[in-house]
UniProtKB/Swiss-Prot annotation:
It comes from Pasteurella multocida (strain Pm70). Required for nucleoid occlusion (NO) phenomenon, which prevents Z-ring formation and cell division over the nucleoid. Acts as a DNA-associated cell division inhibitor that binds simultaneously chromosomal DNA and FtsZ, and disrupts the assembly of FtsZ polymers. SlmA-DNA-binding sequences (SBS) are dispersed on non-Ter regions of the chromosome, preventing FtsZ polymerization at these regions. Residues 11-71 form the HTH tetR-type domain. This is Nucleoid occlusion factor SlmA. GO terms for biological process: cell division; negative regulation of division septum assembly. Homodimer. Interacts with FtsZ. Belongs to the nucleoid occlusion factor SlmA family. Its main location: cytoplasm.
Length: 199
């Protein structure tokens, strides 16, 4: 009889995050996540779960860190591959919305729905993610004058805030519709309105 494969601490931690993500996407994803529920889904005792993560807050922080690292790695690569400002902004927005569509459980974290019963520091951590996204847009918009010799009719910070608000609005609608209304739905039509900012 084969012995069960012993997983490393890193593999176990990743398993916990994968299970938690699936739970957030499930029908019970809006319910409070308890360590007992998470441990049961992972197939370990609560005591064992705490060996992988000292608290539930740390699990959520790890999820946010992972999604942020993944998205901003892709955003950095996209910016390197494209020099035109409008195309850069379009590609980033499309990437962010596509990420949300493919990761509904994580989108519940970004909207704050999954964090309603959790530590306030997690809401602050999500706010940092959106602040970083806004700063990325500001930098790209401000570079337009140097790259293309053109400015905007509005302050770059105002435009960047609007772009982030649009992303957040798509996330909220996606979660509110129980993931039926895709984040990508009607984006290209909405982009045609935004495109006028770059004329």
């Amino acid at each position: 009889m084969q012995k069960p494969v012993k997983r490393s601490l890193k593999e176990r931690r990743q398993q916990v995050l994968t299970v938690l993500t699936h739970m957030l996407h499930s029908e019970r994803g809006m319910e409070r996540m308890t360590t007992a529920r998470i441990a049961a889904e992972v197939g370990v005792s609560e005591a064992a779960l705490y060996r992988y993560y000292p608290s539930k807050t740390k699990m959520f922080e790890a999820l946010i860190d992972n999604l942020e690292a993944h998205l901003f790695t892709r955003i950095t690569q996209s910016v390197k591959n494209e020099t035109h400002t409008a195309a850069r902004v379009h590609n980033i927005m499309q990437m962010v919305l596509d990420f949300a569509r493919k990761n509904p459980g994580l989108t519940r974290i970004l909207t704050g729905h999954a964090l309603m019963f959790e530590e306030p520091q997690l809401q602050a951590r999500v706010a940092q993610f959106f602040d970083r996204l806004e700063l990325q847009f500001i930098n790209i918009l401000q570079m337009r004058k140097l790259r293309e010799g053109k400015g905007f009719d509005y302050e770059e910070r105002v435009i960047a805030a609007h772009l982030v608000n649009l992303c957040e609005g798509h996330f909220m609608r996606y979660v509110r519709s129980n993931f039926r209304h895709s984040t990508q739905q009607s984006f290209e039509q909405q982009w045609r309105l935004l495109e006028r900012l770059f004329a």
